[in-house]
From Swiss-Prot:
Annotated protein name in UniProt: F-box/LRR-repeat protein At3g59200
Superkingdom to which the source organism belongs: Eukaryota
Residue ranges of every copy of the F-box domain listed in the record: 6-54
Swiss-Prot/TrEMBL LRR repeat ranges: 170-197, 219-244, 340-365
Pfam family, one: LRR_At5g56370
Length: 520
């Protein structure tokens, strides 16, 4: 290959080369200026600026002061070179305490004056300049994560007329809830809001009131206290992620347009202690009322129009001890439930009864803490009354099994058998098995094919793993393998090429008579 064919980029029009350089970190983009005189001046037209002081560790021993000086001089030179040219995106990350905050403010004011539309700031111990919150050009604003990045709204005018995305992570919002309300009220066209680790358990209230909002992520790590009051007035919201300790009260919950919700509500340590998961304390053969340790009923009623719902294991716990009665989810067509060995299924019978139009049920693990209260949907103790599963409208059941639970007593297989015995409308059972060990997948498929499908004789059964997809009918694989796939974080192989297709019925033949031999 000759030089001409290898240097095709240089032959591109200058605006195209500048656009390509905009996708590089600014330090790397600047280094291309030594390639030729033409490239030296092209760098001045890059519209995306990305500065990170950690990029200045060049292998030579330098003090923090020296590194900070090199970093600040570089940023100064770049901004001076560009003059008053327009800026699309400005990203600045400063993790070194020796960076001069006055110069940082100057950089931010520089790009604000040049009409920046995306601003991404992560700066240690930095009070954000108020000029950010009256920008007429910002479309996306990301603040944090950083320790002691402070948002002080000490002026009356907060107005971001074009802002559509606001991302706040580990930012200290002054004036507590009032400052936060002031910020949101100044964003008249906001569509996406991400709130990460704000730590508002000490606020008097938190209110998210944005009529134009379509997507909301509300996440806070483990806290020792319950937020006092949380309200949502977002009538056009279609997507919600909410993970936090339950609030003491939810005065207003307006999710009239909600389509999909991922709920990770949890009890605090004190509430978990009060709940005391001992069944002899709160449950008996009679139907003794369990103790409520909080109240999330108003919030759950507020999301009852949702169509797709994901509940974490902790949220199932909240349903049990903080919701009475469980609301009716008339629009719900897909429900995903996460389980673990410490969570009970007490609330599942009531939840499933109140999902009259549910089509797809997804269970991440089947292990849970057994007791008599979950017997309506569980095989651990056969209920005296008919199971709510007998009237279940579910057509597709998806189960995620993991090879790390050392489960050797057959309880998960018995639970699957119980589902097949009780769910009359079931058309498809898909088991995602997180293992690369093919013989284990084959053995699981063999056991599943032997289960008598009493309530759903026409139910198709599939087992999908990293390398194999085993199906009772091969055509069903072709339509399901690439439809609703398991989460990427648990199953990174789902984007790989299709695995080998095997019809286990050809290998194993018809199922034997109903007995327990298929378990072992």
């Amino acid at each position: 290959m000759d030089f001409v064919s290898r240097d095709r980029i240089s032959s591109l029009p200058n605006p195209v080369v500048s656009h390509i350089l905009s996708f590089l970190p600014t330090k790397e983009a600047a280094s291309t200026s030594v390639l030729s005189k033409k490239w030296r001046y092209l760098f001045a037209y890059v519209t995306n600026l990305d500065f990170d002081d950690s990029d200045y560790q060049d292998g030579k021993p330098k003090s923090d002061v020296e590194l900070s000086r090199s970093f600040m001089e570089f940023v100064d030179r770049v901004l001076a070179l560009q003059g008053n040219g327009s800026v699309n995106k400005f990203s600045l990350e400063c993790s070194n305490y020796d960076v001069d905050l006055a110069r940082v403010t100057g950089w931010i004011l520089n790009v604000l004056g040049r009409g920046v539309s995306e601003l991404d700031l992560s700066i240690l111990e930095y009070p954000l300049p108020s000029e950010i919150f009256v920008s007429k050009t910002l479309v996306r604003l990301k603040l944090g994560p950083a320790n002691d990045l402070t948002l002080t709204l000490d002026r009356k005018d907060v107005f971001l007329p074009k802002l559509k995305t606001l991302y706040i992570d580990c930012v200290d919002v002054q004036e507590r809830g009032f400052g936060f309300v002031k910020l949101l009220s100044g964003c008249p066209v906001l569509e996406e809001l991400v709130l990460m680790n704000i730590g508002w358990e000490n606020w008097k209230f938190c209110s998210v009131s944005v009529k134009t909002l379509k997507r909301l992520t509300f996440f806070c790590e483990e806290t020792y206290e319950n937020p006092k009051s949380v309200s949502f007035d977002t009538p056009n919201l279609v997507y919600l992620e909410y993970s936090d300790a339950i609030a003491s009260k939810y005065p207003k919950v307006n999710f009239n347009s909600l389509v999909e919700a991922h709920i990770g509500l949890r009890l605090t340590e004190d509430q978990s202690g009060d709940a005391d998961f001992s069944e002899e304390d709160y449950f008996s053969e009679g139907d003794e009322k369990k103790q409520m340790v909080g109240n999330a009923t108003d919030f759950l009623k507020g999301i009852s129009t949702v169509q797709i719902l994901y509940l974490s294991a902790q949220a199932i716990e909240v349903l049990t001890f903080c919701c009475e009665p469980i609301p009716v989810f008339n629009n719900l067509i897909q429900l995903t439930i996460e389980n673990n060995s410490e969570i009970r299924w007490d609330s599942l019978p009531g939840l499933l009864k109140n999902c009259p139009n549910l089509e797809t049920l997804v269970l991440k693990r089947l292990l849970h803490k057994y007791n008599k209260a979950c017997g309506n949907v569980c095989c651990c103790k056969r209920p005296k009354q008919p199971s709510c599963l007998s009237s279940s409208p579910v057509k597709v059941l998806k189960i995620f099994l993991f090879d790390d639970n050392d489960e050797e007593d057959g309880s998960e297989m018995r639970q699957i058998k119980y589902f097949l015995e009780k769910m009359p409308r079931l058309e498809e059972l898909v088991v995602y098995y997180n293992t690369a060990y093919d013989p284990a997948v084959l053995e699981l498929s063999k056991k599943l094919q032997k289960i008598p499908k009493i309530a759903s004789p026409k139910c198709k059964i599939q087992v999908i793993s990293e390398n194999l997809s085993l199906s009772s009918t091969v055509p069903s694989f072709l339509t399901t393998r690439w439809s609703s796939l398991p989460p990427e974080e648990a199953y990174p192989w789902v984007d790989s090429p299709p695995p080998q297709i095997i019809d286990p019925m050809l290998e194993y033949g018809s199922p034997p008579e109903d007995d327990d031999s298929w378990l072992y």
